[in-house]
Amino acid sequence: MRELTKRQSEIYDYIKHVVQTKGYPPSVREIGEAVGLASSSTVHGHLSRLEEKGYIKRDPTKPRAIEIVSEQTNDAVNMEETIYVPVIGKVTAGIPITAVENIEEYFPLPEHLTSTHNSDIFILNVVGESMIEAGILDGDKVIVRSQTIAENGDIIVAMTEDDEATVKRFYKEKTRYRLQPENSTMSPIYLDNVTVIGKVIGLYREL
């Protein structure tokens, strides 16, 4: 392989470190922040040089699709299969949860975290502390499978009567529904009707 410049070595080492520790490559923005480059076009230029020199392989059709190439075999290093899951921002009543207008970005996840049909999966960023006793903290990303039914005790994403999305534990009582927070300082939400958007099947947290 051809020799790298100092900056190219910094970028290559950072990508390799992230892939080894997280299982998926960093974004262009994250690379720039790590090596002190404010311009994304400059980062793209260095990535192109790394690819030309045989250190990485990229797929232009996918975000973050960077593979480290083994120096010994010149083949892409095998790493866990990564899928790109939509991160949902504002949840709008009457619009499918994964409609384009609801999607803020796509987030890479190791495929084993989903264990279901990838097209049914989305992510919500958790805001608040209503589920801390279930181990779901402010700033976490909950991995959600789209579905419209739930069983008692499921942790779900639901639309309230105020058209707000909330993550709570679901209970169907005789004449109403109870959305129970997992925080002993908070009261449950009681509703005559509830719209289930999905069931929480996993959690992702940056360390």
UniProtKB/Swiss-Prot annotation:
Site (Cleavage) residue list: 93-94
Disulfide cysteine pairs (residue numbers): none
A Pfam match: Peptidase_S24
Record flagged with keyword DNA-binding: yes
Keywords: Autocatalytic cleavage, DNA damage, DNA repair, DNA replication, DNA-binding, Hydrolase, Repressor, SOS response, Transcription, Transcription regulation
Residue ranges the UniProt entry marks as DNA-binding: 28-48
Broad enzyme group: hydrolase
List of catalytic residues: 130 (for autocatalytic cleavage activity), 168 (for autocatalytic cleavage activity)
Listed GO biological process terms: DNA repair; DNA replication; negative regulation of DNA-templated transcription; proteolysis; SOS response
InterPro entries with a match to the protein in the record: ArsR-like_HTH, LexA, LexA-like, LexA/Signal_pep-like_sf, LexA_DNA-bd_dom, LexA_repressor, Peptidase_S24_LexA, Peptidase_S24_S26A/B/C
Catalytic activity: Hydrolysis of Ala-|-Gly bond in repressor LexA
Entry's Gene Ontology molecular function annotations: DNA binding; serine-type endopeptidase activity
Family: Belongs to the peptidase S24 family.
Subunit structure: Homodimer.
Role played: Represses a number of genes involved in the response to DNA damage (SOS response), including recA and lexA. In the presence of single-stranded DNA, RecA interacts with LexA causing an autocatalytic cleavage which disrupts the DNA-binding part of LexA, leading to derepression of the SOS regulon and eventually DNA repair.
Name this polypeptide is given: LexA repressor
Organism: Staphylococcus haemolyticus (strain JCSC1435)
Source organism phylogeny: Bacteria, Bacillati, Bacillota, Bacilli, Bacillales
